[in-house]
């Protein structure tokens, strides 16, 4: 700030702290947006201010209760590709990775562990599911568990010799699993 020929720096913290019943939450007042000017960022933040406070108060009043499991072990997407999606959800849900590695030796224990989650996210698997894994997933859904499948049934291969692209159907051994629930994925 320039006043009377003197320059002074004032430190500003672009967030507010809200508390309720001993819980505290940081409410961002300045919304980060890549590729926009400072003026646009400030204008967008002012427009978003009411929502930011309402969302912060909602998080204080209704703390995290539900749990989301992110399935790993069948060639699912790396964390860097779904980081933004889960970063948005982590303010509202508990999120943990879950593997079906122990299905072959301890299927009952694996099923009991997976039932502790309210939602199972399977993000673009690339490796086939075994019959045991499908059985555990089926039992999870049949006992009231929800699942979000992000499946790409086509694999695109670039032929380096001819320079052409070819699309092939990807067999994840899930056709019968989905068919039981009335879903059919055509590659």
Region spans (language model):
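Short, surface-exposed patches at the edges or C-terminal ends of soluble domains, predominantly
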Residues: 1-187
């Amino acid at each position: 700030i320039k006043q009377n020929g003197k320059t002074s720096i004032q430190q500003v913290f672009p967030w507010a702290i809200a508390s309720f019943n001993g819980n505290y939450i940081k409410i961002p007042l300045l919304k980060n947006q890549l590729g926009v000017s400072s003026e646009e960022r400030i204008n967008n933040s002012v427009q978003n201010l009411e929502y930011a406070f309402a969302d912060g108060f909602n998080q204080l009043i209704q703390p995290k209760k539900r749990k989301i499991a992110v399935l790993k072990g069948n060639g699912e997407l790396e964390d860097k590709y779904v980081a933004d999606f889960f970063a948005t959800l982590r303010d509202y849900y508990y999120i943990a990775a879950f593997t079906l590695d122990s299905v072959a030796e301890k299927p009952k224990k694996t099923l009991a562990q997976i039932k502790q989650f309210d939602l199972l996210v399977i993000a673009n698997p690339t490796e086939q599911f075994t019959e045991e894994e499908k059985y555990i997933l089926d039992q999870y859904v049949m006992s009231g568990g929800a699942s979000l499948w992000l499946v790409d049934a086509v694999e695109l291969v670039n032929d380096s010799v001819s320079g052409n692209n070819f699309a092939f159907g990807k067999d994840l051994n899930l056709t019968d699993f989905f068919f039981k629930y009335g879903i059919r994925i055509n590659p």
